[in-house]
């Protein structure tokens, strides 16, 4: 029993602990979502459609603030062909939220995009960080 306890204590010491944030900053999750604008069978998502999506879906979900960037991505498909696509990149800094909570908050937004614009997926990235204002 003592040996098992000793091993557990050693393993606990190896577990990663979050680094302390600098003075004036606190723990946050940074979330990014990449919304592709190509739509099969029709013209790409327009700027007006994006603005409407922001007003109706994104802003109510994240009223404290966000950043949107224009992006242009590419990937190689199964046939080896490079496909390119314009996108909108949504960046969220969510103070005091862990990655699971951030993912849960963002999921309805990405689901709405996929449904509205017949998208297969929305790339999402979550990472821990520090934020201060």
PLM ranges: what are they?
Residues 20-28:
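Glycine-rich, aromatic-bearing surface loops/beta-hairpins
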Residues 1-5:
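Bacterial N-terminal signal peptides that target proteins for export
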Residues 82-133:
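Helix-rich interaction surfaces within compact, conserved domain-sized segments
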Residues 15-17:
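Bacterial signal peptide processing site
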Residues 10-13:
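C-terminal motif of bacterial Sec signal peptides marking the signal peptidase cleavage site
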Residues 49-87, 93-100:
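Mature extracytoplasmic domains of secretory-pathway proteins
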